[in-house]
């Protein structure tokens, strides 16, 4: 079926950071070719110009990212966008130190309704809330993708006259959003309340090219410097949270093709937890590591090249990154999982 879209199969598509951009497009009914074209045009336009005022401003002009995302998604809100399936985006609200997940589900607690319904709320705090359905979709996605250092904080009016300050959802424990989205699907408070079970819920997690943040010898000698320690620690924490999400999803569920978590626990195949599997889980990714790429994809890339591929603002290697993703998909994706 040439007209088949991922929104025809998935009932909820969500993401963090660049994943939120992709998820929004897929949930609106765009096909993968459209999203590939978006990244080919968006990346060179956004990641250009370098620093404005180093250490006082973000590296790139956030207005460019805002303009590209708005042009892609249109001037729609979470409530009136022409959705084809469920959508979720994750972001970090830094002024309150909280992790937010925003969905297009009208049964979500803060979706709320018309002004009369809001005015009738017995909770005074709820009467001040700007309903989730009024949030501009492009603003939500921009907030989820606003990587610190690269882009500015994104303000979103969450209470009347009081904007919240948001940045990249990767700054939460949901850098890999698989576990959080599994909760969104089943925990009644989020509004979906789908049943759990390996034959009831299938969760597909797609990475964007992971890499274990090993420190080269020259950097290890500088790990005593406070700034170096801080950056190394944050980078490692992001990787650790992603791996932990994979570990929990595989341990609590059934995984047809499990990933190795680490050398100690392996894939967790056969690990017991005392109750039936909560879901079927499948992870797809293309680790940007020399040994894996050679072993799995027969690609020989030097460490210097891999260091460049891992950079968020690398716009010169889009073709190579797409090639890696396509090769990984050919080897990993089994159509039987999708019925």
Predicted features and spans:
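Patatin-like phospholipase
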Residues: 1-72, 104-119
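Extended charged low-complexity segments that act as oligomerization/scaffolding linkers
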Residues: 11, 54-61, 122-126, 130, ...
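C-terminal helical/tail subdomains of lipid-metabolizing enzymes
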Residues: 171-174, 193-194, 198, 208, ...
């Amino acid at each position: 079926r040439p007209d088949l879209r991922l929104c025809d199969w998935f009932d909820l598509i969500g993401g963090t950071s660049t994943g939120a951009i992709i998820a929004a497009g897929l949930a609106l009914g765009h096909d993968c070719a459209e999203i590939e074209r978006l990244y080919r045009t968006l990346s060179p336009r956004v990641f250009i110009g370098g620093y404005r005022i180093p250490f006082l401003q973000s590296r790139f002009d956030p207005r460019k990212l805002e303009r590209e995302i708005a042009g892609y998604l249109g001037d729609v809100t979470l409530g009136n966008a022409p959705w084809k399936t469920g959508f979720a985006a994750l972001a970090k609200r830094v002024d309150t130190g909280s992790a937010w997940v925003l969905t297009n589900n009208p049964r979500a607690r803060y979706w709320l309704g018309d002004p009369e319904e809001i005015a009738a709320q017995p909770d005074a705090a709820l009467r001040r809330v700007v309903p989730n359905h009024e949030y501009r979709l492009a603003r939500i996605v921009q907030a989820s993708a606003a990587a610190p250092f690269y882009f500015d904080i994104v303000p979103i009016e969450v209470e009347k006259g009081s904007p919240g300050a948001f940045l990249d959802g990767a700054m939460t424990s949901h850098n890999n959003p698989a576990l959080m989205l599994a909760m969104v699907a089943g925990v009644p408070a989020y509004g979906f309340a789908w049943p759990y079970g390996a034959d009831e819920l299938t969760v597909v997690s797609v990475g964007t090219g992971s890499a274990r943040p090993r420190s080269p010898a020259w950097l290890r000698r500088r790990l005593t410097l406070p700034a170096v320690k801080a950056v190394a620690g944050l980078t490692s924490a992001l990787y650790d949270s992603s791996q932990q999400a994979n570990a929990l999803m595989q341990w609590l569920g059934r995984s047809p093709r499990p990933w190795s978590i680490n050398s100690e626990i392996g894939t967790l195949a056969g690990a017991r937890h005392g109750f039936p599997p909560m879901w079927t889980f499948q992870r797809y990714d293309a680790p940007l590591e020399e040994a894996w790429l050679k072993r799995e994809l027969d690609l020989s890339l030097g460490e210097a090249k891999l260091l460049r591929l891992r950079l968020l603002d690398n716009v010169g290697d889009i073709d190579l990154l797409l090639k890696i993703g396509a090769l990984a998909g050919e080897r990993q994706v089994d159509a039987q999982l999708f019925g």
